[in-house]
Swiss-Prot record:
This is Alginate production protein AlgE. Has non-porin-like, channel-forming properties and probably functions as an alginate permeability pore. GO terms for biological process: alginic acid biosynthetic process. Residues 93-111 have a biased composition (Polar residues). The gene is algE. GO terms for cellular component: cell outer membrane. Its main location: membrane. Keywords: Alginate biosynthesis, Cell outer membrane, Membrane, Signal. The keyword 4Fe-4S does not apply. It is a peripheral membrane protein.
Length: 493
């Protein structure tokens, strides 16, 4: 298998750090190398809502993640690799969303083997060098390299990407400033970038202040510059060709009571965010021919002016039980910046749960979501969350963003499929029940600098399950239910 130069260089740097383990061991007294072993079983039925044969996932997988970390003075370095093998294309990594375009305009043209996810692959998740000498504060670090960008709500950043990122985290002030661009997936199966990531640059920053004990308020901004080439009208397209580009700016306000901290024992917790989107976007249509070829249509330019909000309240009934409600709304012209996962500790437990359903896995794009939940946590040994979601379209004649639902229709007599459009004028997307239960075994001993790199600080067994019932925005012929259940077992050495 031939690797592209960027992937080969990244893996070379990462494996060089792995081989340097004995040297790195002398640089710090903390545990600085190890391996995370993750076994996953997934059962998923009717992702396509019964619109074609197949669409089910039933498999088990093994995910090995060796890592190495070292520090000397103000300098540090880190790398994490990954080897995955499975009986089906299951979701061993929650960062990898099973999203499809809900607009009905995204067509699978079947010509992009470079983007086909395989059952087994090797990857390099992170490799970065850090410097912490700009200020005397221990929570300050500049990282350069492929790294995990993540914010508390997961709605702006939660991904591994090549970046230069400066973080400042103290008792009263948190700040971030950085730039990022994806150059490679660093995976043996995905040898080309997704079209949305090609030639797309990101600039971002945020600052929040603890204005009174336990209460934070802040601002954040993100700018995306995409100058990728769009094909001219009449040119043939494949799945690796971009169909949109443009320049977009997100500006947001946020306030919370440290609600994403599962150790927070405040009787009443809240969070709230309000974001504005502004910019321009060029898009080309896609037309198909009888011989299964696809061609670029007319290019259209439009202004993007949208907004989104996410609000939540959580009441602590006693040291173990909490109940709460959350509401999210994104206008028809709003989209997220593409670096999000929408996973966070919003139910008040250690488990990072998808804000828009473990089965539906929606995005903030012309979607309104109301959620009710109850959560339980016993010491640091167990936690559980039971969640109800109701999903609606804000504009009944406009598509939605990506989701874990992939209802399709066959294109005539060809062997290709495209997304099934939603019913015009109908807003009810459906409802869902989620259950997430976790048993923790032991606390991990990891360097503080790696808090963003690991989703879980300890060994565990976790069930993530969701049952989705589609609403009348989907066609009458679709199945009544779709479910997704994932069991993860994680251990560290």
């Amino acid at each position: 298998m031939k690797l592209n130069p960027l992937m080969a260089a990244g893996m070379g740097l990462g494996f060089t750090l792995f081989w340097a383990c004995p040297t790195l061991a002398a640089l710090t007294e903390q545990q600085n190398f190890g391996i995370e072993i993750k076994a996953t079983a997934q059962a998923e039925d009717d992702r396509d809502l019964g619109t074609r044969s197949g669409g089910d996932v039933n498999g088990v997988g093994l995910d090995l993640r060796p890592w190495v970390y070292g520090e000397r003075g103000d300098w540090s370095g880190y790398a994490m690799g990954q080897v995955v093998t499975a009986t089906d294309t299951i979701q061993t990594d929650p960062l990898e969303q099973s999203n499809s375009d809900g607009s009905g305009t995204q067509t699978s043209r079947g010509t992009a083997s470079e983007r086909e996810v395989e059952k087994s692959y090797a990857a390099l998740r992170e490799f970065w060098i850090g410097y912490s000498g700009f200020t005397p504060y221990p929570g300050e670090i500049l990282k350069v390299g492929r790294q995990r960008l993540r914010n508390d709500d997961g709605q702006w950043h939660d991904t591994n990407i090549e970046a230069i990122n400066w973080n400042f985290d103290t008792t009263l002030l948190r700040a971030e400033l950085g730039a990022a661009q994806r150059f490679s997936e660093y995976r043996t199966d995905l040898t080309e970038l997704a079209p949305d990531d090609e030639d797309r640059k990101h600039l971002f920053g945020s600052a929040s202040y603890q204005w009174t004990p336990g209460h934070w308020a802040g601002v954040r901004a993100h700018y995306s510059h995409d100058d990728g080439k769009l094909k001219s009208q009449g040119e043939q397209l494949d799945d690796l060709d971009k169909t949109s580009n443009g320049n977009l700016t997100w500006l947001g306000l946020q306030a919370d009571s440290d609600a994403y901290n599962y150790r927070n024992t405040t009787p009443l917790n809240y969070w709230g965010s309000l974001t504005w989107l502004n910019g321009t976007r060029d898009e080309i249509g896609v037309t198909s021919a009888a011989n299964d070829q696809f061609f670029a249509g007319e290019k259209n330019s439009r202004d993007m002016n949208g907004w989104a909000t996410d609000l939540g309240l959580r009441l602590r009934l006693d040291p173990q039980w909490q109940v709460g409600a959350a509401y999210s709304r994104a206008s028809k012209d709003y989209i997220q910046n593409g670096l999000e996962s929408n996973r966070s500790n919003w139910t008040g437990t250690r488990s990072r749960i998808h804000r828009f359903g473990e089965a539906f896995q929606g995005e903030m794009a012309n979607v309104e979501t109301g959620s009710l939940f109850a959560s339980w946590q016993m010491n640091e040994e167990y936690d559980a969350s039971l969640i109800y979601h109701k999903f609606r379209r804000v504009d009944g004649n406009t598509g939605i963003g990506g989701s874990g639902i992939n209802a399709v229709r066959e294109n005539g007599d060809s062997n290709t499929f495209s997304s099934l459009p939603l019913e015009d004028g109908r807003k009810d997307l459906g409802q869902e029940m989620d259950l997430v239960v976790t048993k923790y075994f032991k606390q991990g001993l990891l360097p503080a600098s790696l808090s963003q790199s690991f989703d879980e600080p300890s060994a565990l067994v976790r069930l993530r399950a969701g049952v989705f019932k589609p609403g009348d925005a989907y066609h009458n012929g679709v199945d009544e239910y779709m479910h997704r259940a994932v069991v993860d077992v994680i251990w560290r050495f």
